[in-house]
Amino acid sequence: MLVPDKNPQTVSEKLSDHYRKIEQYMHSNKLVINSDKTYLLVMAGRGAASTRRMEVQVQAGPDLIEQSVSEKLLGGVIHNTGRWNEMIKGGKGSIVSQLAGRLNALKKLQQADFKCKLTVATAVIQSKIQYLLPLYGGAPDYLVRALQVQQLKAARFVCGYSSFYWSRDKLLKTCGWLSVRQQEFYSTTLLAHKIVSTSLPHGLWTDMVQPHTVRTRAATQGQIRFGTNYRGESEMTRSSFKYRAQRYYSRIPGTMKIQPLSSFKKHLKQFAVRNIPVK
């Protein structure tokens, strides 16, 4: 259930009403909703909004559902401030911690050849970094650098002892990998292109793609245009997927956007290598 509103009382009433409707629907189908396994996460920035957030509550029958500071959803840790510290670097279950554990496990392949080590490292390191990257890619640079350190350690392991003094560019090129920032640009832009091309998922498409009312250069190049109600002043909004997708998609040439998907992917990767610095 998603209820966007600034008034905590309105949010509480709407959420409680939604909960009652779901409870009635489940009871009519001989199912039971468990309030102990229903969680409440209220997103807000800093300042007054953060104070108002504490007033939100949900009445679930005789029980009162209390707010959570963070919750795990589809493998990602969502924090009520919209920040990604806990997911990327904050604890045993963070991405950095998991990557460090996987790097230790890779040492068992020390005697394997380059191809074997590259295949395994791509599967266990690269895939972990890439998962949900369009979502958390707006995280501060110091968090992204922590991921970049782990990626370079994996690349150095794959390339062997002779790569100890190699540059970052040479390491990544030898492995055929993009840096974390380059991957973030690539995956976010690719997802934006799929949304624009297929009009799916419909919710994101209607939010992100508004028709150009005037034939401008942005219109002819197929750039994403938000509606007039969109506001991008807050820090949380500027780091969001939609904001970054619009900004990245505007950077690539219009000629790329009309290519078949396979060609688009190839040229987008080349564009990322040329234009996004390795950080």
Could you describe each region identified by the protein language model?
Residues M1-V3:
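Short beta-strand->loop micro-motif that forms the acidic, two-metal-ion catalytic signature
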Residues K6-E13, G82-S94, L109-T119, G137-L147, ...:
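Conserved, non-catalytic sequence blocks in retroelement Pol enzymes and Pol-derived host proteins
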Residues H202-R244:
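Amphipathic alpha-helical
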Residues E23-L41, A48, K72, L143-Q210:
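Short, charged alpha-helical motifs in flexible N/C-terminal segments and linkers
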Residues L64-L135:
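Basic, alpha-helical interaction scaffolds
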Residues V11, D17, Q24, S28-V69:
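Short, conserved micro-motifs composed of acidic
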